[in-house]
């Protein structure tokens, strides 16, 4: 009887903890740490590759991806915690991004794509854009950097999960400056007190900087975060020049 009661309690608890979005493990390779958020309806909206923060596929990554998915954009979530637990190089990361795009552009029938990164993932964004083969760069409609810092190490450091003032060995600003015409969005929190925020340093015409309420995680308001992106990036059915 005691075992039956324990089983019943476990079932009741699990019923209240089911995720709002039916995310699925990615199929490209277990080495990449992918999560799939597909959509059922055909649409001209692009697919999204979402590079997570160093905490892995966590609350902000899930929350914003659910918003993107709800608006017709299938998402491939890429866990930085899994992938960068061992150090990578920009070239390695780009090669694996190409693997992801080759698989999902075909499977989901979406050639156009949007690149989104949060925190650690945001710092990777300009590096991989600058190293993409032309065909994949040409199908990229824009990129979003959420709470990026001025440098990355392409490797997870546990201390960085607590303190966001790291001095990485790969500066992000020169990489952003090398992207001349692709629409870029840099989003920061008004209360983010990190001394190494990237957004205030970005002045080029193809970069839009947005400041939202909250700190590093934008008060967990994923609807406002989604709208700040959707209102500023041309990701509808219109083809974009690069």
Model-inferred region functions:
Residues 6-15:
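Bacterial N-terminal signal peptides
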Residues 20-43:
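N-terminal cap/lid segment of alpha/beta-hydrolase-fold proteins
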Residues 38-73, 77-80:
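Short, surface-exposed "cap/lid" segments of acyl-processing enzymes
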Residues 87-108, 127:
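Alpha/beta-hydrolase active-site loop
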Residues 116-125:
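Gly/Ala-rich beta-loop-alpha elbow adjacent to hydrolase catalytic centers
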Residues 143-154:
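Active-site nucleophile loop of the alpha/beta-hydrolase fold
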Residues 153-204:
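The feature captures the conserved acid-bearing segment of alpha/beta-hydrolase catalytic domains
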Residues 207-242:
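C-terminal catalytic histidine-bearing segment of alpha/beta-hydrolase fold enzymes
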């Amino acid at each position: 009887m005691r075992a039956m009661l324990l089983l019943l309690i476990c079932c009741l608890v699990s019923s209240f903890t089911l995720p709002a979005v039916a995310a699925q493990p990615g199929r490209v390779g277990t080495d990449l740490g992918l999560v799939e958020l597909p959509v059922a309806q055909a649409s001209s909206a692009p697919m999204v590759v979402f590079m997570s923060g160093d905490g892995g596929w966590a609350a902000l990554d899930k929350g914003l991806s659910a918003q993107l998915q709800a608006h017709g954009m299938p998402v491939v979530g890429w866990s930085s915690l899994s992938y960068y637990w061992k150090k990578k190089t920009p070239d390695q990361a780009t090669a694996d991004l190409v693997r992801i795009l080759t698989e999902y552009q075909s499977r989901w029938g979406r050639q156009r794509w949007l690149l989104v990164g949060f925190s650690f993932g945001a710092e990777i964004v300009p590096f991989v854009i600058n190293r993409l083969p032309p065909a994949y760069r040409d199908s990229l409609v824009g990129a979003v950097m959420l709470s990026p810092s001025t440098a990355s190490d392409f490797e997870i450091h546990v201390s960085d999960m607590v303190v966001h003032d790291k001095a990485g060995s790969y500066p992000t600003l020169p990489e952003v400056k090398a992207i001349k015409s692709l629409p870029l969005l840099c989003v920061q929190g008004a209360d983010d007190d990190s001394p190494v925020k990237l957004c205030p340093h970005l002045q080029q015409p193809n970069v839009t900087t947005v400041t939202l309420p909250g700190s590093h995680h934008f008060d967990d308001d994923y609807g406002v975060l989604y709208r700040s992106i959707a209102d500023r990036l041309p990701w509808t059915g219109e083809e974009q020049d690069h």
